[in-house]
């Protein structure tokens, strides 16, 4: 017999049905979210996946195109989180001085620390980027090497043009020596003397010279691990 007054409260049976419907809806939403995440990961490139983990990998010669790309990645990662570390992995023989300095200046401008890692080699301008990482967060892998030297340039033309280009190369040489000196603690005079010719250092020598803070023998600790 039905209730002639019509109770305003749902019966226990109705409550159970509502709970089951809610659980089924939550399950469908969770499955949909999981599928969307899976589809997104399938569409992401390896570079995208690294960037999602705040990792930037610089490989090959440094030139304007890849320097601009690295600068954009650094700026993007800062916009995502102004405090969390960026991890810059370097395997490069160096390249354009101006392209190198574009990356270096951006690294110094960021509010978030940039940890640097030498993987294979960091030579010429790439060594400047390795050295320019956040203090205490510059690393060499055990079998990597670092090489520094004065800027190279080949010019031709009228004598006046050659003189102009030579003066510019000397200016860059002095600027790079000052940058290296400021990060490793050696005098500018010592840097100029050591880099007059190709100056190679293995990982341990790079640490002793003050170019990096330590050798990386295991997986870098995340900020969550440190907390």
Curated annotation (Swiss-Prot):
GO terms for biological process: protein quality control for misfolded or incompletely synthesized proteins. It is an enzyme of class 3 (hydrolase). Keywords: Cytoplasm, Hydrolase, Protease, Serine protease. Its EC number is 3.4.21.92. CDD domains: S14_ClpP_2. One of its GO terms (molecular function) is ATPase binding. Its main location: cytoplasm. One of its GO terms (cellular component) is cytoplasm. It is found in: Cytoplasm. Fourteen ClpP subunits assemble into 2 heptameric rings which stack back to back to give a disk-like structure with a central cavity, resembling the structure of eukaryotic proteasomes. Belongs to the peptidase S14 family. NCBIfam families: PRK00277.1 (NF001368), PRK12553.1 (NF009205). This is ATP-dependent Clp protease proteolytic subunit 1. It comes from Rhodopirellula baltica (strain DSM 10527 / NCIMB 13988 / SH1).
